[in-house]
Amino acid sequence: LKCIGELSKRISCAAARPNLSFQNPDSIAAYYMEQLRHQEQEIMICMMLDNQNHLLNDTILSKGTVNATLITPREVYLEALRYHAVSLILVHNHPGGNPVPSQCDREVTERIFRAGEMLGIGLLDHIIIGDRQAVSMREQGFWLEPSKNKG
């Protein structure tokens, strides 16, 4: 019965958000804040978007420890390809409450960004949720320039 309740909740949430789109990082942070800010472990979510930046689906890619989560470009882009995503946004939490990106956050983001360039699926942002605050890596200047070596 517990599984049926969870399945029902997931179906109703999915049905309640057709063509859901976000205008800026603050609207994304607000959408995920309550889901993530009280978690005791890092959770990485991938938002998959269509060509008009409407949310196709979001999925939890990883549940980690109190200060780390393991994620690889392979896992990210398998999900993106499954939903025919044109672009994606990563969202994860820092259980300690401070949303400032760590060096590891920057390195993982760069690997995922570069893999997306090769696949033609853009990583638009990586948003980190803390306690009642969030950081957009793009807005804070922790973003990347496209590679010059294309083709």
Model-based region annotation:
Residues L1-Y32, S136-K148:
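Accessory alpha-helical DNA-binding modules that contact the DNA backbone or grooves
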Residues A30, S62, V66-G151:
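Active-site-proximal loop/helix of nucleotide/amide-processing enzymes and allied scaffolds
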Residues R37-E40:
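Short loop/turn motifs at secondary-structure junctions and domain boundaries
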Residues I43-I45, L124:
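Short loop/turn microsegments at loop-to-beta-strand junctions
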Residues I45-C46, L88:
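Conserved active-site beta-strand-loop modules that form the wall/rim of enzyme catalytic pockets
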Residues D50:
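Short, acidic, Ser/Thr-enriched surface-loop or helix-capping motifs
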